[in-house]
């Protein structure tokens, strides 16, 4: 037997397996076992009938529930309200309480002084600053005194007291203008952090979707390469019969042998690439060793081929883009803080108002009801009014804060203007490319159908000795290239589609809708409830 016939015997004896190609051994699983693993992997309920395949939505939801990378993102959720809470400290209520016991045996310094004075005092109340810049203090107190005045004897008294004090800024924090700016700046910063996290989740999804498309594309390359190898092996069989009749040349033999060998090498390389990308996807989904060692060519991976028109997404402005919104909120917070710095450089004019009342009982065992009734009904009131004025002569700290805020504001304004211009340009480019990819996909789909007809015609002509092996190989290679272009265009279309969604600020809403559809809650609600890692 000639070397060429040995070569044909090896390649035509049966279908080419991964083990024959030198691929790493993988766990042999039946189709039923693969379906069981997929259902476990994707948390598919038993009520869902039919076969299950990996699609981008199911992979994304599984990764959200399992992956360490997504868990790392969710760990930032508790940091979102920090800036808002730091500013709300200004309006937090404070409860205070204190008590004191005094035993005084000092020598009297006058004829009417006491030579013994014992006092027990207790004071409790609450302080709060309102958003109007008003500081309120409400307090209740109790004093019990026992005094000895020499020959005059002992005097016992019990005094209850109440007070309400109000302090209002009339200039620097004019009826809370500066306080509200601080509160609003904290809210803007927290909202900016939330949007920043949403943008990071979008970026995380784009990386995951890119990996998913690579796995799908690697499978399609292997399918196309196997089909190409089958065609070339079929051609080799036809060539062997013609050679036995003495109507083939050595150059044609070399050409056919080389084509089969090259395709075999391509198939091995693509198999290795698929195994590598499948391992990365398994890690992203935090699956087990059994899943990693499963033959990835047996996993059904689905990518939608019905392409939508991007006209609607391209018509809307980019103002909802999360990067733009984040910068706008950061700029708003900075402008509010600049206003606070200007306020702090102004003079301070304070108005203080107060009302106090008391109830006192002398030399009585315990008249609790009497003294507190007098206190709470303000039977014996006292009123105070006062003004205070402070003028900063240098205000060095305030000046430094104003200059710093002014510089940072100008930087953010420039960044925002540049980002908005770049996003508009990116939107126009993405829309044009997306429309082009959609047209190309439809063209490649038609070309592939035509090329399949052509390869059949070329093989028929070769059987009839009306064509050469080169023509058959060329037709097969052109079909192979067209098929790869078709699948590459589809994967690229989906990559651009999701990138366009991010540019428009619509991607996170879609991801949130996926999670809500599965769990009934949003991403952040699930994370807060502990339903996500």
Task: Label every PLM stretch briefly.
Residues 3-15:
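Bacterial N-terminal signal peptides
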Residues 17-36, 40-46, 105, 279-297, ...:
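Acidic, low-complexity, intrinsically disordered peripheral segments
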Residues 194-318, 433, 437, 457, ...:
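Periplasmic alpha-helical coiled-coil/stalk elements that build and connect Gram-negative outer-membrane
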Residues 243-250, 462-466, 503, 507:
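A short glycine-centered flexible hinge/capping loop motif at secondary-structure junctions
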């Amino acid at each position: 037997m000639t070397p060429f016939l040995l070569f044909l015997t090896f390649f035509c004896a049966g279908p080419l397996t991964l083990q024959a190609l030198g691929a790493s051994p993988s766990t042999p699983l039946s189709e039923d076992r693969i379906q069981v693993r997929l259902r476990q992997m994707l948390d598919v309920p038993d009520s869902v009938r039919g076969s299950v395949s990996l699609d981008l939505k199911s992979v994304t939801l599984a990764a959200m529930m399992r992956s360490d990378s997504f868990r790392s993102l969710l760990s930032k959720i508790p940091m979102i309200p920090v800036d808002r809470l730091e500013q709300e400290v200004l309006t937090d209520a404070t409860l205070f309480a204190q008590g004191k016991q005094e035993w005084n045996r000092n020598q009297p310094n006058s004829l009417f002084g006491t030579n013994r004075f014992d006092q027990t005092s207790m004071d409790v109340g609450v302080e709060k600053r309102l958003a109007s810049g008003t500081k309120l203090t409400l307090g209740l107190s109790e004093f019990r005194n026992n005094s000895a005045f020499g020959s005059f004897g002992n005097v016992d008294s019990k005094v209850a007291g109440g007070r309400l004090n109000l302090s209002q800024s009339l200039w620097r924090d004019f009826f809370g203008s500066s306080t509200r700016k601080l509160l609003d700046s904290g809210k803007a910063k927290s909202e900016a952090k939330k949007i920043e996290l949403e943008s990071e989740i979008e970026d995380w999804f784009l990386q995951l979707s890119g990996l998913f498309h690579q796995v799908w594309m690697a499978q399609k390359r292997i399918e196309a390469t196997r089909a190409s190898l089958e065609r070339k092996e079929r051609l080799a069989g036809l060539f062997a019969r013609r050679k036995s009749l003495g109507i083939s040349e050595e150059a044609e033999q070399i050409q056919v042998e080389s084509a089969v060998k090259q395709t075999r090498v391509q198939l091995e390389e693509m198999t290795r690439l698929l195994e590598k990308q499948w391992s990365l996807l398994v890690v992203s989904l935090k699956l087990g060793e059994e899943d990693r060692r499963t033959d990835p060519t047996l996993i059904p991976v689905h990518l939608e081929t019905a392409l939508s028109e991007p006209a609607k997404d391209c018509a809307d402005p980019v103002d909802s883009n999360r990067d733009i919104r984040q910068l706008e909120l950061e700029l708003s917070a900075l402008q509010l803080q600049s206003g606070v710095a200007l306020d702090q450089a102004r003079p301070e004019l304070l108005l203080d108002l107060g009302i106090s009342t008391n109830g006192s009982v002398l030399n009585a065992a315990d008249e609790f009801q009497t003294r507190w009734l007098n206190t709470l009904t303000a039977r014996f009131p006292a009123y105070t009014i006062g003004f205070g004025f402070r003028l900063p002569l240098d205000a060095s700290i305030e000046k430094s804060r104003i200059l710093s805020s002014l510089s940072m504001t100008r930087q953010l304004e420039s960044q925002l203007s540049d980002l908005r211009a770049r996003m508009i340009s990116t939107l126009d480019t993405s829309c044009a490319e997306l429309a082009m990819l959609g047209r190309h996909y439809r063209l490649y789909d038609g070309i592939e159908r035509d090329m399949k007809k052509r390869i059949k015609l070329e093989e028929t002509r070769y059987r009839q000795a009306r064509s050469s092996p080169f023509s058959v190989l060329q037709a097969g290679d052109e079909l192979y290239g067209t098929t790869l272009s078709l699948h590459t265009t589809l994967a690229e279309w989906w990559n651009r589609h999701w990138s366009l969604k991010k540019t428009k600020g619509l991607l996170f809403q879609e991801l949130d809708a996926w999670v809500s559809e599965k769990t009934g809650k949003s991403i952040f609600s699930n994370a807060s409830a502990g339903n996500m890692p």
